[in-house]
């Protein structure tokens, strides 16, 4: 059974919830995803479960898997450069707090280019523009990183 919970966005949860992805993306009219994950989730096939669904639907994406535990400023900057180079128009984050927080930081800098890096965002609220549209696919419980606009 798929359930729906609304907070900052819409949360689908329950068995088969990932199958909602293609319909959601198509309804929004997005063309290409920037899929932010970590190397272990790629290595163990977790990210592939998502990209297999996307492949079956002919959805374009690029995987960025250089996210480290407790990501650094440089890690976020690398992600910003990769997002820009990808030509993506939305983001999918897969993982725990590190992937979610890195994705949120990347997205806010992409849509607010007046900020050079995450340090320049400290204490700034609200930003001029919202973050890049992001679909969060958590693989852990407890951080709530997928449900908040903040990143640490």
Descriptions of predicted regions:
Residues 1-90:
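ATP/NTP phosphate-donor binding region
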Residues 74-152:
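Glycine/threonine-rich beta-strand-loop-alpha-helix active-site module
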């Amino acid at each position: 059974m798929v359930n729906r919970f609304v907070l900052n966005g819409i949360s689908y949860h329950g068995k088969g919830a990932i199958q909602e992805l293609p319909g959601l993306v198509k309804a929004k009219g997005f063309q290409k995803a920037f899929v932010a994950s970590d190397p272990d989730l790629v290595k163990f096939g977790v990210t592939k479960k998502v990209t297999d669904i996307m492949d079956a639907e002919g959805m374009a994406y690029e995987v960025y898997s250089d996210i480290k535990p407790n990501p650094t400023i440089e890690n976020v900057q690398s992600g910003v450069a990769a997002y820009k180079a990808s030509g993506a128009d939305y983001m999918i984050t897969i993982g725990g707090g590190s992937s979610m927080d890195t994705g949120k930081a990347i997205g806010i800098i992409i849509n607010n280019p007046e900020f050079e890096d995450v340090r320049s965002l400290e204490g700034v609220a609200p930003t001029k523009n919202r973050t890049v549209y992001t679909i969060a696919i958590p693989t852990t419980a407890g951080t709530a990183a997928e449900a908040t606009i903040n990143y640490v």
